[in-house]
Amino acid sequence: MDPQLPEPEPLVSLIEALRRLPGVGVRSARRMAYHLMQHDLQGADMLGRALAGAVQNLRHCARCNSFTEDDICATCANPKRDPSVLCVVETPADQNMIEASHGYRGLYYVLMGRVAPLEGIGPRELDFQRLLERASDGVVREVILATNFTAEGETTAHFLGEVLAGKGLKVTRLARGVPAGSELEYVDAGTIAWALMERKSA
């Protein structure tokens, strides 16, 4: 319910900005905004500066498409990683969960999304051509499709599997230990490690 009293425009703008966060409705956004303005002005200032710094200084890695301050991220530049295996994930959060499993030492490619026809998101919007060029560099031998086990994630994996296999690459999919309909961000590290070990041909 909207408040009976009119709110100052800067406060309304802050509430609307906070509502853009996933899972945050108008009530939660209003509660956050009032908390920051009433109890934590220092935190509000830190949040504003951190957001501005991230927007200004972060870019996409030229190789894996994840976030970095440099042209090439630290993971892609690490000589101890296995460049012959490429793991494709939807988001940087999914990449972090796979890394936390300690079961993978290859490289990554982050799609920054998934195929969702009803939302107008297809291969062109996700720049699949860039992934195909990355996977066809002559070094990659296996591509692990680690998209989420949702309808959109499965559609994405199916499409990529067909195209990548047509390039002569070995294409595998995480094992079904990851529950159907789940997102990797919320799956425990042990389950992800098992799913990586038991991965199957896509």
Curated annotation (Swiss-Prot):
<dbReference type="GO" id="GO:0008270">
    <property type="term" value="F:zinc ion binding"/>
</dbReference>
<feature type="domain" description="Toprim">
    <location>
        <begin position="84"/>
        <end position="179"/>
    </location>
</feature>
<dbReference type="InterPro" id="IPR000093">
    <property type="entry name" value="DNA_Rcmb_RecR"/>
</dbReference>
<keyword id="KW-0863">Zinc-finger</keyword>
<dbReference type="Pfam" id="PF21175">
    <property type="entry name" value="RecR_C"/>
</dbReference>
<dbReference type="Pfam" id="PF13662">
    <property type="entry name" value="Toprim_4"/>
</dbReference>
<dbReference type="GO" id="GO:0006310">
    <property type="term" value="P:DNA recombination"/>
</dbReference>
<dbReference type="InterPro" id="IPR023627">
    <property type="entry name" value="Rcmb_RecR"/>
</dbReference>
<dbReference type="InterPro" id="IPR006171">
    <property type="entry name" value="TOPRIM_dom"/>
</dbReference>
<comment type="function">
    <text>May play a role in DNA repair. It seems to be involved in an RecBC-independent recombinational process of DNA repair. It may act with RecF and RecO.</text>
</comment>
<dbReference type="InterPro" id="IPR015967">
    <property type="entry name" value="Rcmb_RecR_Znf"/>
</dbReference>
<keyword id="KW-0227">DNA damage</keyword>
<keyword id="KW-0862">Zinc</keyword>
<dbReference type="Pfam" id="PF02132">
    <property type="entry name" value="RecR_ZnF"/>
</dbReference>
<feature type="zinc finger region" description="C4-type">
    <location>
        <begin position="61"/>
        <end position="76"/>
    </location>
</feature>
<dbReference type="Pfam" id="PF21176">
    <property type="entry name" value="RecR_HhH"/>
</dbReference>
<dbReference type="InterPro" id="IPR034137">
    <property type="entry name" value="TOPRIM_RecR"/>
</dbReference>
<keyword id="KW-0234">DNA repair</keyword>
<dbReference type="GO" id="GO:0006281">
    <property type="term" value="P:DNA repair"/>
</dbReference>
<keyword id="KW-0479">Metal-binding</keyword>
<dbReference type="GO" id="GO:0003677">
    <property type="term" value="F:DNA binding"/>
</dbReference>
<protein>
    <recommendedName>
        <fullName>Recombination protein RecR</fullName>
    </recommendedName>
</protein>
<keyword id="KW-0233">DNA recombination</keyword>
<comment type="similarity">
    <text>Belongs to the RecR family.</text>
</comment>
